[in-house]
């Protein structure tokens, strides 16, 4: 079963290119990844992007994950921008799904761009992941 994308490839790629530029501009030199020391600065630059660009980039990355890992056993929440389900396994029909991942739009885009590593984000509390299938580290970076 194919996943129906909510964001067109052209719109999503254009929005994500703007997000990637934030990471590429700030993350140069010897520290290629987001760290506790530079996260606030990068997040402020990300927040200055138009809301529509941020929303489109997040939704595009959610669509990409759902395409790479189709299924319904993990729900990925990135409030207020979007949600998707992915990973094959037990399907839920009501209530909380068996596995849930939740994070901010900034962290989601950083993971998708490869500017942040899943294990670092999880260990530092920048995302929450519960359930046996909630470790999505093998899918990142998405782009």
Predicted regions and their residues:
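Feature captures hydrophobic
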Residues: 1-143
